[in-house]
Structures are given as C-alpha cells and as structure tokens.
A protein has these predicted regions:
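Extended intrinsically disordered or low-complexity regions, especially N/C-terminal cytosolic tails and loops
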Residues: 1-114, 142-155, 161, 177-258
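Substrate-binding/catalytic groove segments of enzymes
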Residues: 167, 172-177
Length: 258
C-alpha cells in the first residue's frame, strides 16, 4: 500500500521571500494608486457639490458645528497628510518585521528549505523579541544580528519624527524632532530624467535623493508630489531591504554548503 501522505505534512516550511516581497510591493502600489485617486478627486471637488451633499439628508448631527467648504478643504488636507505618513510608517515597520522573521528562520535553519520544529520555535522566539522594540532598535538589531545595513534608515526615522509632530504637536516641528544641526531633514527618492526616446515617448531616469528641511517652529507642509514621493521612498526602502535579506540568505547557504 502506497503512502499518500504529502511529504513534510505538518512540518513548517521556509518562508518564500520573493512572494513576501511581491505581496508587499503590490500593497505599496495600491496605496500609491489610492493616494493619486484621492488627490485627483480633491482637485475636482466644487463648493456647490459639497453644499449639495451637505444638504441632501435635510438634517445634520450638530448644525452649529458645521464647517464650510474652505474649512473642510483644510481639514481634509491635514487628515490626508497624517494618514499617508501614518500608513507609510506602518508599511515600513511591517516590511522590517517580515524581513526579520525570514532572517531568523534562515539563521536558525542555516538556510535549509526544511524547517524543523525546533528551528521554527527559535525563529518565533527571536521574532517575539523583535516585534515590540522601538524603530531605532529594530534597525540596530538587523545590523547587529544579521549585518543588514538599511538604506534610507535616516528617512524612516525622520518620518517617525514627522508623524510624532503631526499627531502630538499640531504639525509644528519642535526640539525633540531636531538633529544636532537644529534641523529635521527628510530625504525622499525622486527621479532624474536622463534621456527620452522621442518615438516611443519613454523616459529613462534614475532615482536620486531630494532633501526637505524643516527648522524648529516650522509647520510640516508637503506638496501633492512630495506625498507621493514619500510612498516611493518607502517602496525603495523595502526593495533595498528585501535585496539585503536575500543576499544574507545566500551567504548563509553558501557557508553551509561549503
């Protein structure tokens, strides 16, 4: 009688890094597309349409608190900025957490595709210790435990400070967010166009850094394109991180095979 039990049934398997990375980047694109949709919708909205929608139910929860079109434009913009930066921070942390679990599995298994219960438990223990730590400590542990130097680490840290100022200080930069030079610096990834194919209408470019500097007491203001570039920067950060993780896995496997 043949054994129809699938091999390694119930046995934990190595995480598919490529699949994790693809799913993460697909999520990034959805966030980017949604932001573009919201920005386009905001450009098209008219005061008459807003007032018509306000009056459609013929009743309000608290009429004296009603805000006019200009007030709601400012409020909606502030809400959008906080949402975009908050979502970006969540995405960055999620990417780091996913990367760390893969790294922990690789280390525990010496990059074997088969994961023993003991190795899986060891990786889970490491992950439980990693999840609750502060952002700067996550970067430290990735470097100390796995030799992973994260590109754009400073940008992610700065976004954390920006979110702190938006949520706790009314969007005004204060001393806790400043560096040794008295500045809050955010480096964003943007594209420098190098050449264009006239016939195909295609542009060739490369990613470069674009600095945005805030001083103490300044309000955190971002253009529409800068909000989009924040998402591009998070995507660039994640892409670099996943590539570094892949190189780590290869180095561990090569060492194990030698």
């Amino acid at each position: 009688m043949s054994d129809n039990t699938p091999p390694n049934q119930g046995q934990p398997q190595q995480v598919n890094l490529q699949q994790v990375a693809q799913q993460f980047m697909a999520g990034m694109q959805r966030h980017f597309d949604m932001l573009a949709f919201n920005l386009a919708a905001r450009e098209c909205v008219q005061e008459e349409a807003y007032n018509a929608r306000i009056n459609a139910p013929k009743v309000m929860p608290a009429g004296p608190r009603h805000q006019n079109f200009e007030q709601m434009q400012a409020y909606a913009r502030d809400l959008l900025v906080r949402q975009v930066i908050g979502d970006c921070m969540n995405l960055a942390v999620t990417g780091m957490n996913n990367a760390h679990f893969f790294l922990a599995l690789v280390k525990a298994t010496k990059a074997s595709p088969q994961v023993s219960p003991e190795a899986h438990a060891e990786a889970q223990k490491s992950q439980r210790a990693f999840l609750p730590v502060q952002l700067d400590e996550k970067f430290n542990r990735l470097e100390q435990d796995y030799g992973i130097m994260c590109e754009l680490e400073d940008s992610i840290i700065s976004l954390g400070f920006i979110l702190q100022a938006l949520m706790q200080q009314g969007g005004i930069v204060k001393e806790p967010q400043l560096d040794a030079k008295g500045e809050l610096v955010l480096e964003l990834k943007t594209v420098e166009i190098l050449s264009r194919e006239v016939d195909a209408g295609k542009a060739h470019g490369k990613l470069i850094d674009q600095r945005k500097v805030f001083k103490e007491g300044e309000a955190l203001v971002f253009s529409d394109v800068e909000l989009q570039l924040i998402l591009v920067t998070i995507a660039s950060f994640a892409d670099s991180l996943f590539k570094s993780v892949s190189l780590y896995a290869k180095s561990v496997k090569d060492a194990s095979d030698s």
